[in-house]
């Protein structure tokens, strides 16, 4: 019906638009009426003085119709709830062939015999001229009526499609409803005078509607619609009696349904009375199929609001505040290309002679582009590392921009996920070409191709709107904004996340732009400078959130700026494609200004494209001055011009979005920052800017808001490909200060996806609040609850002031468990309590100050009054009332109505119960909540029952006593008094009934024996024999009501059981039992637990006037998670709800905070709070070497040369590849572990009886390769001393048991031209499908040094070392330290490592705590093919292992210590066999508390230090795991290594990264000296005891290795989805499980296992 009415009004408007001359009506010649909602449509035309007024009047009438529909729906739900899954049932049936009087008599008889509640009566709603009668009422009542009324039952009848609820019902509606429906009409329309307007005849009695203005007309029409029986014959009679008629009157009917009986009846009636009257009928319905009318093509409002933004920009501008500070400080942040991009020295040649080099070493760069929170975005570290950092930072900034905008999915129409799009500009993808392309892996395509950048955002946030990646070169991001605006204006989306992306990692674009003469060789963009010599490339990531302005205002968003227009054109007439063209730019500006309706002189600031090129700056200044500041007419206000590129460089695809964000910050800070691009003098090609009133700000210029002049900024963003994009930005609209809602206590919520981020979020909010103590608490609460996305780790606090919130947050921060973890939303149970705790003014504060609750109670109060029970509102509003003077009828009805209203409130707030339970009187509200009873039925039953009590029972003759004791306790204590058990709430919470005299004696007896008891303030003893007189009569009354199907399970305290279906329950019998039988609450809850309806994780919400059942539930449900009250008598309503909502928020119950704040949203604001604090780790594939320079010029060595290699030692075998160039060199060597000499090295060093290659073999490899490369790169220079440091041991190298096939190890060393640092990586090779796969074993760096300087340094403290050694030896002599012989040393060692004889160099040792000194004599070598023999390096240094694995300072019985690595190893002279050396060490626990030990080993010959191993690190390993770690594979071609892991790293790096912390001797400038990230394959300590199997450990190790997640992160509660296992990675894991674990599983297994715990349990149970 509503749709018909809307169409009707619209059709009328369109019809008269075509024929405007016909829109002329007056009292003498025009007459209107209508049926149903069509009656309201008629009032829209009558209330419109002219055709121009009709659209806005029609819109108001549509709103009236909507509110009327809402009222009908509410009434239908009160009378008979409609469940979501139930079919629609008609509220009206037409009966033909019976006189109205007969039907009315049958209705009266039925309603009386059935004792139908007054509000549920069946009634007549329409009487047609042919005698047909429309009978209306609740569908269940209609069915019952037609089944029992013989006369009507036999008459022809048909249900009508009336599903909206009861209408034309005077017993249900009155003038208050009419006033509510019309109350929101626009005052300008409502006050419109209607003198001389045409008549509107009532469809009830045919009388003209009275009223002096439009509001009166609307109210009268609505009242007729709601209350009057439609009698069309009365309308016809009234029409015939009008004084307008003459014999030859012409009647013109305009109708939408000319064939309807009503129209035919009208024509027949008129022509029978006036035969000469001619009738013409205009069928306005033809318009429906008329396609000649085209919809308007110009939108009413094309203004676009920017509501959120975020950035990652150079110069440390990782957020908007730092960006503004950079602008305000006037910083120029250009720098040399950092080492994490490429080696700037080797890839730059300012002469341009060297192939593929850049001419400039400069750029502007984001500090740490690899930082990313992979787990937040459900990405594995493996996928994150292979994903372009532009994509990752797009995700981060998109989230921050959405957070800034207050985005919550589906909160409003404009935030519906299906209507949100993403558009990003991007013109390069260096990471794909230079970084990820070095080792192409499974995520190469989705991780690097441009389309995936916006697509990944849409996928993560589940946006279904349009997603575009836009490339227009340098103007890509502003072009993306234009696309976004167009999508919004055209209605293709309601919100768009847009931005620009640029991260520079490769040298190719630098080289290409250099050779195209785009780039400056001297530094940053010198915008407007006379010496401008090109632009400076820059990183840039920016994201903004866009909405239509009207939507943003409706959503209560913070509007940062308004885009009035944007356009793009192309410089097709330029002299070349890359050359700018001023006339084309000029045309573009005028187009944008015209689009916005703004004059050029209204614009006071132009944010220029300003690349700092001679051609670009000159063309742009020409076009700008011609349009915005021509000589004539001269501007009256200054025009300021500037460019952000002077600060941050040219961000290329991100340039436009950077300029836009700058302009938005200018509005925020009311100032224009100074321009820093002029380094020498103003460009001499510029016109006289002073004369044109054009100014370049040389200092920060205040630019405040003015009420009489709006601020506009034109933003230019031009493309090297010839495109020009401009955007006109208007300052945000001014909003009045909010007054704030009436609440006195508010909830502030925090959440995160990890505990690390949660703590950081907490700390940042505390810091912000301490600096903003004047912040509005209501807005703070609104921002953190209604305008935030909530994650699984949660904190919620409440307070009445900001100071209270700060204190509460500090208290939470001091807890060991910071917040609650919500793995999934818990189930919710509603408890409806009884009536024993009633008090005056129950819920009065909520009623007075929270409109939705008040409206619910007012609706319920109407039902009370319609049933003749009177109003309950005085008992709520009068807080000083004497409860003892209130009747039982009032208290019981108030209790039930409050419970129903609270139930509706909680449901509106998103708290949906999975099960409900009622106690005593509360069972009525529980039946309502479960769907068995309507609100009207519940109120009717409670009211009738209470009236019977008041009539048939004597008030206050019986009493009820709540006892803290068991039934047996009471029986034992009370033996001489008669009582009945009324309620068993918990095993030791019993309510009994007795006569007043006995109840007093019983209470005294219980108290005397130590039992607490409370007499309930109730006039009757429910569930006792006092109820017997009312039972039969109440059962009869209750037969008028039938239970409907339960929508949710009901735990019945009457039945002490859980009802899932209500079909077996007879309402009258059940309600009789509820009145008389004891309420067995505890048994019911226990039964619900047995049935699985509730458990310890269920959150209980008590709905009643006070919290009375929390103790009972806790006594019955073990380990109860939470129970919260709705109201309490001892605290304010706001306090109770705040505490309860805190608990619900923390436990994960979905709360619709937006709905909570909806009534007061205009009075709160979205605050600019600190953004989400990420748990960042560095995911970065470092570009290594020079392949971008040499490309295919490098010599290939695909086949192993047959010639004798030029390098061969025991450990270094075949040269696979070598290249030596002016910019450095690289060598790749391959060795066979199964080679006799190599295997002998491993055999001399066994762990768990298995050969293991000593890590002290690696110095020999490192020094051998380093000397070889040095001699090749610097053949004329003598070999220097060398230091092998930054060694990280990633895996142990164990020879396979099967020695029949080779086991390859590959060594790769890279060197810079000066050989200052030679980087070594050692990897094992496995053969997977004939494809060699490398797994890194160790890494380190050889540095060249000066032997003499080392000796000079050591000489300064050699005497101190000697003194300490002497002291230790004296302590050994005195028994204060332990002296250990050679045999005992290696006997002790044998528990861990079994050394061959030539490794056993220690002759004796002295141990004291973590300190030791050893005498060492090195064994001779059998041949000379060693550079640093392992059997020399190992014994000279393994004194550190002796201290930890054999001394008394550590628990070496349960723990062993294995080598992790060292920072530096240097020897000032060669070690000589047979010489006596002395090794000293003191190990110290690592400062980070990891259990690692670190120490320096000093090697002395006589009194001189000849060597030092600095920072030698050993890690602990449980001794029980030795066999697992050092048990090599039996066969196969796979890599025969077992993973031994170092401690957790602060970052995840996928190649050497300069962000790794360096030691004091490390060269921080070298980009290739960072440690390599270990593969992760540690055993994870089991937390599920039954899952501690080899299979589970292997599975977890595989998961860790393939996802890149740290093993410690694989806890039982870890969600598999958070590991980033997608469909692609799941296929890899399936293959790995099959080949390595011999377990065959489906790929969906990883996508369907929620947590690691379930994964473990599945594996344990299945295998």
From Swiss-Prot:
Residues 301-731 form the Ketosynthase family 3 (KS3) domain. Its EC number is 2.3.1.-. Binds 1 phosphopantetheine covalently. Residues 1586-1663 form the Carrier domain. Keywords: Acyltransferase, Phosphopantetheine, Phosphoprotein, Transferase. Residues 1213-1349 are annotated as: N-terminal hotdog fold. The modification O-(pantetheine 4'-phosphoryl)serine is found at residue 1623. PROSITE patterns: CARRIER (PS50075), KS3_2 (PS52004), PKS_MFAS_DH (PS52019). Residues 1376-1523 are annotated as: C-terminal hotdog fold. Residues 1544-1580 are annotated as: Disordered. Gene3D superfamilies: 3.30.70.3290, 3.40.47.10, ACP-like (1.10.1200.10), Malonyl-Coenzyme A Acyl Carrier Protein, domain 2 (3.40.366.10), Polyketide synthase dehydratase (3.10.129.110). Disruption phenotype: Leads to complete loss in coumarin biosynthesis. Pfam families: Acyl_transf_1, CurL-like_PKS_C, ketoacyl-synt, Ketoacyl-synt_C, PP-binding, SAT. Residues 830-1149 are annotated as: Malonyl-CoA:ACP transacylase (MAT) domain. Residues 1209-1527 are annotated as: Product template (PT) domain. It is an enzyme of class 2 (transferase). The keyword Acyltransferase applies. Its cofactor is pantetheine 4'-phosphate. Residues 1213-1523 form the PKS/mFAS DH domain. The active site is at residues 474, 609, 650, 1245, 1434. Pathway: Secondary metabolite biosynthesis. GO terms for molecular function: fatty acid synthase activity; phosphopantetheine binding; polyketide synthase activity. Non-reducing polyketide synthase; part of the gene cluster that mediates the biosynthesis of the bicoumarin kotanin. The non-reducing polyketide synthase ktnS first catalyzes the formation of the pentaketidic 4,7-dihydroxy-5-methylcoumarin from acetyl coenzyme A and 4 malonyl coenzyme A molecules. Further O-methylation by ktnB leads to the formation of 7-demethylsiderin. Then, an oxidative phenol coupling catalyzed by the cytochrome P450 monooxygenase ktnC forms the 8,8'-dimer P-orlandin via dimerization the monomeric precursor, 7-demethylsiderin. Multidomain protein; including a starter unit:ACP transacylase (SAT) that selects the starter unit; a ketosynthase (KS) that catalyzes repeated decarboxylative condensation to elongate the polyketide backbone; a malonyl-CoA:ACP transacylase (MAT) that selects and transfers the extender unit malonyl-CoA; a product template (PT) domain that controls the immediate cyclization regioselectivity of the reactive polyketide backbone; and an acyl-carrier protein (ACP) that serves as the tether of the growing and completed polyketide via its phosphopantetheinyl arm. This is Kotanin synthase. The gene is ktnS.
């Amino acid at each position: 019906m509503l749709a018909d009415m809307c169409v009707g009004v619209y059709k009328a408007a369109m019809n008269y638009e075509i024929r405007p001359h016909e829109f002329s009506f007056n009292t003498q010649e025009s007459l209107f009426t209508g049926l149903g909602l069509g009656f309201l449509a008629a009032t829209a035309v009558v209330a419109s003085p002219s055709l121009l007024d009709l659209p806005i009047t029609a819109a108001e009438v549509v709103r009236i119709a909507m509110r009327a529909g809402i009222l009908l729906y509410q009434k239908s739900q009160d009378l008979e709830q409609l469940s979501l899954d139930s079919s629609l049932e008609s509220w009206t049936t037409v009966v033909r062939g019976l006189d109205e009087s007969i039907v009315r008599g049958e209705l009266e008889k039925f309603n009386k015999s059935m004792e139908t509640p007054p509000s549920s009566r069946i009634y007549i709603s329409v009487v047609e001229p042919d005698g047909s009668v429309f009978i209306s009422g609740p569908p269940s009542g209609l069915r019952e009526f037609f089944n029992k009324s013989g006369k009507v039952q036999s008459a022809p009848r048909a249900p009508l499609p009336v599903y909206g609820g009861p209408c034309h019902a005077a017993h249900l509606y009155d003038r208050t409803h009419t006033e509510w429906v019309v109350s929101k009409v626009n005052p300008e329309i409502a006050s419109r005078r209607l003198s001389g307007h045409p008549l509107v005849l009532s469809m009830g009695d045919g009388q003209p509607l009275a009223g002096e203005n439009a509001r009166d007309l609307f109210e009268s029409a609505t009242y007729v619609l709601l209350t009057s029986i439609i009698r069309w014959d009365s309308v016809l009679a009234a029409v015939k009696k009008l004084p307008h008629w003459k014999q030859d009157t012409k009647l013109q009917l305009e109708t939408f349904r000319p064939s309807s009986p009503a129209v035919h009846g009208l024509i027949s009636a008129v022509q029978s009375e006036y035969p000469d009257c001619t009738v013409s009928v205009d069928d306005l319905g033809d318009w429906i199929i008329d396609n000649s009318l085209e919809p308007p093509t110009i939108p009413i409002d094309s203004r676009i609001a920017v509501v959120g933004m975020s950035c990652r920009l150079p110069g440390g501008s990782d957020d908007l505040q730092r960006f503004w500070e950079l602008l305000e400080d006037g910083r120029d942040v250009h720098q040399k290309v950092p080492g994490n991009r490429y080696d700037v020295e080797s890839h730059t040649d300012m002469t341009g002679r060297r192939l593929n080099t850049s001419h400039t070493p400069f750029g502007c760069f984001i500090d740490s582009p690899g930082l990313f929170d992979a787990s937040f975005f459900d990405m594995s570290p493996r996928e994150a590392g292979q994903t372009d950092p532009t994509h990752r930072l797009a995700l981060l900034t998109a989230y921050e921009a959405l957070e800034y905008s207050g985005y919550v999915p589906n909160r409003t129409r404009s935030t519906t996920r299906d209507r949100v799009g993403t558009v990003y500009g991007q013109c390069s993808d260096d990471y794909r070409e230079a970084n990820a392309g070095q080792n192409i892996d499974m995520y190469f395509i989705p991780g690097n191709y441009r389309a995936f950048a916006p697509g990944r955002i849409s996928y993560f946030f589940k946006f279904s709107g349009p997603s575009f990646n836009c490339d227009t070169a340098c103007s890509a991001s502003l072009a993306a904004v234009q696309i976004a605006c167009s999508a919004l204006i055209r209605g293709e989306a309601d919100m768009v996340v847009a931005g620009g992306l640029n991260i520079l990692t490769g040298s190719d674009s630098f080289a290409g732009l250099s050779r195209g003469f785009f780039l400056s060789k001297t530094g940053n963009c010198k915008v407007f400078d006379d010496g401008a010599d090109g632009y400076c490339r820059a990183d840039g990531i920016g994201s903004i959130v866009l909405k239509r302005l009207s939507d943003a205002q409706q959503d209560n968003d913070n509007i940062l700026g308004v885009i009035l227009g944007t356009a793009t054109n192309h410089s097709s007439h330029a002299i070349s494609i890359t050359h700018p063209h001023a006339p084309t730019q000029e045309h573009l500006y005028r187009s944008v200004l015209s689009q916005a309706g703004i004059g050029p002189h209204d614009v006071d600031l132009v944010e220029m494209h300003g690349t700092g090129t001679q051609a670009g700056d000159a063309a742009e200044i020409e076009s700008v001055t011609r349009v915005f500041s021509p000589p004539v007419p001269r501007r009256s206000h200054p025009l300021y011009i500037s460019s952000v590129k002077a600060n941050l460089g040219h961000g290329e695809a991100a340039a436009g979005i950077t300029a836009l964000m700058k302009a938005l910050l200018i509005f925020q800070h009311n100032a224009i920052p100074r321009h820093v691009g002029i380094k020498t003098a103003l460009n001499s090609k510029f016109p006289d800017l002073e004369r044109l009133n054009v100014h370049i700000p040389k200092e920060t210029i205040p630019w405040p808001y003015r009420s009489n002049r709006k601020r506009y900024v034109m933003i230019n963003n031009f493309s090297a490909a010839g495109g020009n994009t401009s955007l006109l930005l208007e300052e945000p609209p001014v909003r009045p200060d909010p007054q704030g809602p009436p609440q006195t206590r508010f909830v502030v919520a925090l959440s995160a996806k990890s505990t690390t981020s949660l703590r950081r979020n907490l700390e940042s909010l505390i810091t912000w609040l301490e600096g903003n103590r004047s912040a509005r608490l209501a807005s703070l609460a609104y921002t953190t609850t209604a305008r935030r996305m909530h994650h699984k780790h949660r904190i919620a606090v409440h307070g009445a002031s900001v100071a209270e919130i700060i204190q509460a947050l500090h208290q939470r921060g001091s807890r060991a468990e910071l917040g609650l973890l919500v793995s999934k939303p818990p189930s919710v149970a509603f408890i409806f309590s009884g009536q024993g705790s009633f008090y005056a003014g129950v819920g009065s504060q909520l009623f007075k100050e929270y409109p939705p609750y008040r409206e619910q109670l007012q609706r319920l109060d109407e039902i009370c009054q319609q049933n003749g029970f009177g109003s309950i509102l005085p008992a709520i509003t009068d807080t000083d009332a004497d409860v003892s003077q209130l009747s039982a009828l009032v208290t019981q009805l108030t209790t039930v109505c409050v419970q129903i209203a609270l139930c509706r409130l909680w449901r509106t707030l998103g708290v949906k119960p999975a099960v409900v339970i009622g106690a005593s009187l509360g069972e009525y509200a529980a039946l309502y909540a479960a769907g068995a009873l309507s609100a009207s039925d519940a109120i009717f039953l409670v009211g009738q029952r209470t009236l019977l009590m008041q009539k048939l029972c004597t008030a206050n003759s019986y009493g009820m006593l709540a006892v803290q004791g068991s039934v047996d306790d009471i029986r034992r204590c009370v033996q001489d008094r008669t009582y009945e058990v009324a309620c068993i709430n918990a095993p030791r919470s019993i309510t009994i009934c007795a006569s007043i005299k006995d109840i007093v004696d019983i209470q005294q007896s219980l108290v005397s024996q130590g039992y607490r008891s409370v007499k309930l303030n109730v006039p009757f003893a429910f569930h006792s024999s006092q109820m017997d007189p009312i039972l039969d009569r109440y059962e009869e009354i209750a037969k008028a009501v039938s239970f409907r199907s339960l929508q949710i399970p009901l735990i019945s305290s009457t039945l002490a059981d859980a009802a899932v279906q209500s079909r077996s329950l007879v309402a009258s019998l059940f309600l009789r039992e509820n009145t008389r039988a004891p309420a067995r609450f505890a048994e019911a809850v226990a039964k619900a637990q047995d049935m699985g309806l509730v458990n310890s994780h269920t959150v209980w919400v008590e709905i009643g006037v006070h919290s009375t059942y929390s103790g009972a539930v806790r006594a019955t449900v073990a380990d109860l998670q939470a129970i919260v009250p709705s109201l309490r008598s001892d605290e304010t309503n706001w306090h109770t709800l705040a505490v309860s909502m805190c608990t619900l928020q923390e436990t994960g119950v979905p709360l619709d905070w937006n709905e909570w704040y909806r009534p007061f949203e205009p009075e709160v604001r979205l605050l600019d709070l600190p953004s989400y604090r990420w748990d960042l780790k560095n995911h970065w594939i470092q570009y290594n070497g020079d392949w971008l320079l040499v490309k295919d010029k490098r010599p290939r060595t695909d086949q192993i040369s047959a010639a004798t290699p030029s390098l061969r030692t025991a450990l270094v075998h075949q040269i696979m590849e070598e290249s030596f160039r002016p910019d450095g060199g690289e060598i790749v060597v391959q060795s066979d572990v199964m080679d006799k000499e190599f295997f002998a090295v491993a055999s001399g060093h066994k762990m768990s009886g298995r050969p293991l290659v000593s890590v002290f073999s690696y110095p020999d490899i490192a020094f051998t390769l380093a000397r070889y490369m040095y001699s090749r790169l610097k053949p004329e220079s003598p070999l220097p001393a060398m230091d092998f440091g930054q060694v990280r041991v990633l895996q142990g190298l164990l020879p396979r048991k099967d020695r029949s096939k080779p086991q390859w190890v590959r060594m790769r060393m890279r060197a810079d031209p000066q050989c200052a640092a030679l980087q070594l990586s050692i990897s094992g090779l496995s053969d997977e499908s004939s494809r060699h796969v490398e797994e890194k074993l160790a890494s380190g760096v050889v540095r060249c040094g000066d032997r003499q300087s080392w000796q000079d340094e050591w000489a300064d403290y050699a005497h101190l070392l000697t003194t300490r050694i002497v002291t230790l030896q004296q302590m050994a002599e005195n028994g204060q330290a332990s002296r250990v012989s050679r045999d005992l040393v290696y006997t002790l060692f044998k528990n861990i490592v079994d050394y061959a004889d030539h490794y056993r160099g220690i002759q004796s040792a002295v141990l004291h705590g973590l300190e030791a000194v050893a005498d060492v004599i090195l064994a001779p070598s059998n041949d000379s093919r060693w550079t640093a023999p392992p059997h020399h390096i190992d014994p000279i240094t393994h004194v550190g292992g002796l201290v930890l694995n054999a001394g008394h300072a550590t628990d070496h019985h349960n723990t062993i210590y294995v080598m992790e690595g060292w920072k530096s190893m240097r020897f000032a002279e060669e070690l000589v066999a047979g010489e006596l050396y002395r090794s000293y060490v003191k190990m110290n626990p690592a400062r980070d508390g990891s259990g690692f030990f670190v120490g320096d080993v000093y090697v002395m010959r006589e009194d001189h230090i000849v060597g030092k191993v600095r920072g030698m690190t050993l890690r602990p390993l449980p001794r029980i795991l030795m066999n697992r770690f050092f048990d090599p594979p039996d066969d196969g071609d796979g890599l025969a290594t077992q993973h031994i892991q170092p401690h957790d790293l602060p970052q995840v790096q996928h190649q050497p990264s300069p962000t790794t912390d360096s030691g004091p001797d490390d060269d921080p400038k070298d980009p290739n000296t960072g440690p390599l990230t270990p593969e992760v394959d540690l055993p994870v300590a089991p937390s599920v005891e039954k899952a501690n199997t080899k299979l589970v450990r292997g599975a977890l190790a595989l998961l860790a290795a393939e996802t890149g997640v740290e093993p410690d992160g694989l806890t039982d509660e870890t969600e598999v989805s958070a590991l980033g296992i997608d469909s692609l990675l799941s296929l890899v894991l399936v293959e790995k499980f099959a080949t390595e674990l011999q377990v065959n599983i489906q790929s969906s297994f990883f996508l369907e296992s929620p947590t690691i715990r379930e994964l473990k349990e599945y594996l344990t149970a299945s295998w």
